[in-house]
């Protein structure tokens, strides 16, 4: 099942080891070679259940706001605590649409295939590169802000404007944004 009701928080199924999307954008398809129905962003937590023909079969639990039939952003948890880690772009034919739950947030389970090289065991290297890119690029115009100076939602509003000024490539922007949001989300200091 590609999209199903889930009763627990974001992340991989409890019996699987957590891995992460380690590339800025990973297309998620129902089968290798099929068109994607969703895109997972760097830092999305997944469980790899199999690898075949250059693709990894993954499962993850995420959250959507509103009616999943309308498609849209996928989050690690309901906002303001969650970080956007993907987008549901199409409803695979014949799959269940879960009913909404508290405050309009719906937990969903996604199951599909991503390129095998999109999955990493640790985000350490990805985050170090994003942090270095953030510090060197932003330092050209101003003193870089500490990630915990803004909430994940605020970084989502600030970063697109800054990326235009810095002429960042979309993949660079996505990696830096997710590093800022995840670092901000794990800090105790909030503005």
Language-model regions, residue ranges each:
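Short, flexible, mixed-charge glycine/proline-rich loop motifs
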Residues: 128-132
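The canonical Cys-X-X-Cys-His
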Residues: 134-144, 176
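Basic/aromatic-rich interaction segments and small domains that mediate binding to polyanionic partners
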Residues: 59-69
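Gly/Gly-Pro-rich "capping" loops immediately C-terminal to redox-active cysteine motifs
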Residues: 143-166
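Mixed-charge (acidic/basic) macromolecular-recognition segments
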Residues: 122-127, 146
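SH3-family beta-barrel domains
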Residues: 4-35, 39-41, 49-54, 73-123
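C-terminal capping alpha-helices of c-type cytochrome domains
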Residues: 166-191
């Amino acid at each position: 099942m590609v999209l199903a009701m889930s009763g627990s928080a974001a992340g991989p199924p409890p019996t699987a080891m957590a891995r992460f999307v380690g590339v800025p954008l990973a297309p998620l398809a129902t089968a290798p070679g099929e068109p994607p129905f969703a895109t997972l962003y760097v830092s999305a937590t997944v469980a790899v259940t199999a690898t075949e023909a250059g693709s990894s079969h993954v499962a993850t639990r995420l959250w959507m706001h509103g009616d999943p039939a309308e498609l849209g952003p996928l989050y690690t948890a309901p906002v303001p605590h969650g970080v956007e880690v993907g987008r549901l772009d199409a409803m695979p034919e014949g799959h269940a649409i879960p009913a909404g739950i508290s405050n309009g947030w719906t937990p969903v389970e996604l199951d599909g295939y991503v390129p095998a090289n999109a999955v990493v065991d640790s985000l350490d290297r990805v985050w170090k590169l994003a942090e270095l890119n953030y510090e060197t690029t932003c330092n050209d115009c101003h003193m870089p802000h500490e990630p915990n100076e803004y909430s994940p939602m605020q970084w989502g509003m600030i970063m697109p404007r800054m990326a235009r000024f810095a002429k960042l490539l979309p993949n660079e922007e996505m990696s830096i944004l997710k590093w800022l949001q995840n670092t901000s989300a794990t800090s105790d200091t909030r503005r």
